[in-house]
Amino acid sequence: MKAAVVEQFKKPLQVKEVEKPKISYGEVLVRIKACGVCHTDLHAAHGDWPVKPKLPLIPGHEGVGVIEEVGPGVTHLKVGDRVGIPWLYSACGHCDYCLSGQETLCERQQNAGYSVDGGYAEYCRAAADYVVKIPDNLSFEEAAPIFCAGVTTYKALKVTGAKPGEWVAIYGIGGLGHVAVQYAKAMGLNVVAVDLGDEKLELAKQLGADLVVNPKHDDAAQWIKEKVGGVHATVVTAVSKAAFESAYKSIRRGGACVLVGLPPEEIPIPIFDTVLNGVKIIGSIVGTRKDLQEALQFAAEGKVKTIVEVQPLENINDVFDRMLKGQINGRVVLKVD
């Protein structure tokens, strides 16, 4: 089968023929139709996270397609089902985290496109219990980004605790941020979009953002405080230390700062202000299978629409270059089939 493979860190991916995966008990073989491109894939290819993936590696954790083969022990899925393979490739199923609905914190989890091969290929093996079905009225290209960008931001907004009518600031209007704006509006929240790109802020306005601010032109935190008295919550998708610092300063008393993006730096937090103002700082990592089902339902009902640019698998290195330069609006989806 054809696949895009990381053979050396920080080197171009090789699009080549590799062996088609074989499945075993509890697994399914998915014929990949499309796969979204996430910033995490870039980290996997560069090997710049503390825990590096083993090479060679096929990246991709937004792979969607059709089940072509069902392994022994699988009774809830059949050949022909439309499914996606999320970042949470599998978890142990019996630790405290798995049993309490926090499976994304499982210490024995496997991750698609990082610890196991992912969706930058014509075929992908998957743990049957962790694939999620795609609603019939969503195309593969529309559905793919929901499997990471969508569920990640939807879950992050849930954990803010923000209520309808309250204000939330979305820092970074890229692959995650553009769907975060839509989920926030669908949840009844007022939205401030923050980004360094005017074209991305224009997209945010088209998607329903109530206010937009560019930190190149204004101190975003001060501007937000002047306009709305501070936000009840922030969701930071930008891979930028400055964005996290600004997001913290933009929160009103009792608010929540939810961290999603993963910049390499450490961020100093003023303990006195955090305690005195009752500010909550929360890390949020993707979402559970249930979160993913809910996120897909918003898209199926037309309340969230991913903005996608379709590219052939062979263009992956060009896509990575553009991603590094911040030149992508919405999400790039690789057409694999």
Swiss-Prot record:
CDD domains, per the entry: CAD3
SMART domains: PKS_ER
Phenotype when changing residue 40 to S: Little decrease in activity
InterPro entries membership: ADH-like_C, ADH-like_N, ADH_Zn_CS, GroES-like_sf, NAD(P)-bd_dom_sf, PKS_ER
Activity regulation statement: Substrate inhibition is not observed with any alcohols, and the enzyme-NADH dissociation is not considered to be a rate-limiting step.
Effect of residue 43 to R: Higher level of activity at pH 9
Superkingdom of origin: Bacteria
Keyword line: Metal-binding, NAD, Oxidoreductase, Zinc
Task of the protein: NAD(+)-dependent alcohol dehydrogenase.
Record NCBIfam families: PRK09422.1
Family: Belongs to the zinc-containing alcohol dehydrogenase family.
Protein's UniProt name: Alcohol dehydrogenase
Organism: Geobacillus stearothermophilus
Gene: adhT
